[in-house]
Regions:
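Terminal alpha-helical segments
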Residues: 1-134
Length: 134
């Protein structure tokens, strides 16, 4: 892949990941934060799910830049991302694991309402997204 192709790929995946994150922030704002907690689980869950999806978009772009693709007909899982990221960037793996637990498990599935925890999940997602910033 040429440098120009890599740049175009970064721009495409970065823009899409940021679009997801902006949408997630809009949904989170609807959850009505009071003090250190959000008060509408529906919007918290939605926002966390969208933010996690944005993180996955960024990871897909990052792995494509490294010429890593899933096998045809295989569904990508957290294990796919973890096993490939661990070979490339251990710090990114820490951000991925943290964001996975906060955004996907605690936020999306459990509807955690603690604003500090959710912010940490969003921050970790942005650290991954910034890895493909053009």
């Amino acid at each position: 892949m040429s440098i120009n192709e890599q740049q175009l790929l970064k721009e495409e995946y970065y823009a899409e990941a940021v679009r997801y994150m902006n949408n997630a922030k809009e949904n989170l704002a609807k959850a009505k934060k009071e003090g250190k907690f959000y008060h509408d689980k529906k919007y918290v869950r939605t926002a966390c799910g969208i933010a996690y999806s944005g993180l996955l978009v960024a990871l897909d772009g990052f792995l494509r830049l490294k010429d890593i693709k899933p096998k045809p007909k295989d569904r990508k899982s957290i294990e796919f991302y973890q096993s490939n990221i661990t070979k490339i960037d251990k710090k990114m793996l820490d951000y991925l694991n943290s964001a996975y637990h906060i955004l996907h498990l605690s936020g999306y599935y459990d509807g955690i309402e603690n604003a500090t925890v959710i912010k940490e999940g969003f921050d970790n997602a942005y650290k991954i997204i910034d890895k493909i910033k053009p």
